[in-house]
């Protein structure tokens, strides 16, 4: 979910931390690169074990992940750049929160170098214990999230939800149908977004969004996948009981996704191009119920 400058000068998404955009002349081509930190994070329980011994103390993650909120959520220090390390500080008592305490990001270009995130549900085939996901969109009775962020950080970064949809129940690797993003805030340079169909203002469950969408290239998944972005009006730093189900149903009504696809999980995090030290998630929760 990296923002990249397209040839037109607009900023477009680079979907998923396992990918990087490389340019050849004036043409842009997506190429899959190794995402060691991400794949290690998907291992989940094994990676978390050492850090879990200090559950009631302040913990620091550097290129690793850990459970928070008991085992309900997973925090991943995902860094896919090549510059100095990045570390996250976890709060005591296992709260669902983290702070970027060390950031070596310094990319002056258009590719983000890191995506520290918190996860509920499934991502790249690994699921947080006890999660109700994956579920078909049509099977969701409710899906809401509360996310509070702290954004007093210098540099170039953004903050958003990342919802992946797959044609089958569990995507063992990259989800193959759609990525629905809900953006809260970002630094100005990487906030200009316009898909081929333009941007429209929509209202979903009483909230105003700016909606844009397009289909990705085919270099990563056969046939590509749909990219749908809902950007919250007013660039808030926090949302309470955000209705994720309503956003997905709105996208389905517009024929951008299918109600038969499976929601894999809910991720929320910050992409960081430069700086970012001090960015924080101070509160996070997801509640999902299914239809009987």
What are the roles of these predicted feature ranges?
Residues 3-49:
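Secretory targeting and sorting signals
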Residues 51-107:
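Solvent-exposed N-terminal domain segments of exported/luminal and surface proteins
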Residues 96-100, 141-147, 161-163, 262-272:
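Short, hydrophobic/proline-enriched secondary-structure or compact coil segments at domain edges
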Residues 104-115, 152-156, 170-173, 238-239, ...:
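Short, surface-exposed beta-strand/loop "edge" segments at domain boundaries and coil↔beta transitions
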Residues 114-199:
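Extracellular-facing segments of soluble proteins and assemblies that are Gly/Ser/Thr-biased and enriched
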Residues 162-164, 181-183, 210, 248-250, ...:
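Residues within well-ordered beta-strands of beta-sheet-rich folds
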Residues 168-243:
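Short helix-loop boundary/capping segments
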Residues 226-228, 232-292:
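Long, compositionally biased interface segments
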């Amino acid at each position: 979910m990296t923002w990249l400058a397209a040839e037109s000068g607009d900023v477009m998404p680079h979907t998923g931390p396992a990918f990087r955009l490389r340019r050849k002349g004036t043409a842009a081509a997506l190429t899959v690169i190794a995402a060691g930190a991400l794949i290690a994070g998907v291992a989940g329980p094994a990676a978390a074990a050492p850090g879990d011994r200090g559950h009631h103390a302040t913990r620091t993650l550097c290129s690793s992940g850990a459970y928070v909120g008991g085992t309900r959520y997973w925090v991943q220090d995902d860094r896919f750049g090549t510059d100095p390390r990045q570390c996250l500080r976890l709060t005591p008592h296992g709260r669902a929160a983290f702070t970027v305490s060390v950031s070596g990001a310094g990319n002056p270009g258009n590719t983000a170098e890191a995506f520290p995130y918190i996860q509920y549900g499934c991502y790249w085939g690994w699921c947080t214990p006890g999660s109700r996901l994956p579920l078909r969109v049509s099977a969701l009775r409710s899906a809401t999230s509360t996310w509070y962020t702290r954004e007093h950080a210098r540099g170039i970064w953004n903050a958003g939800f990342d919802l992946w949809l797959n044609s089958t129940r569990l995507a063992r690797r990259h989800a193959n149908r759609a990525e629905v993003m809900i953006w809260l805030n970002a630094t100005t340079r990487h906030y200009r977004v316009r898909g081929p169909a333009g941007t429209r203002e929509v209202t979903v469950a009483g909230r105003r969004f700016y909606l844009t969408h397009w289909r990705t290239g085919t270099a990563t998944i056969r046939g590509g996948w749909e990219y749908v972005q809902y950007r919250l009006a007013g660039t808030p730093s926090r949302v309470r009981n955000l209705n994720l189900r309503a956003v997905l149903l709105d996208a389905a009504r517009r024929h951008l996704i299918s109600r038969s696809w499976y929601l894999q999980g809910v991720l929320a995090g910050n992409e960081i191009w430069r700086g970012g030290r001090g960015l924080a998630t101070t509160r996070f929760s997801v509640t999902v119920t299914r239809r009987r």
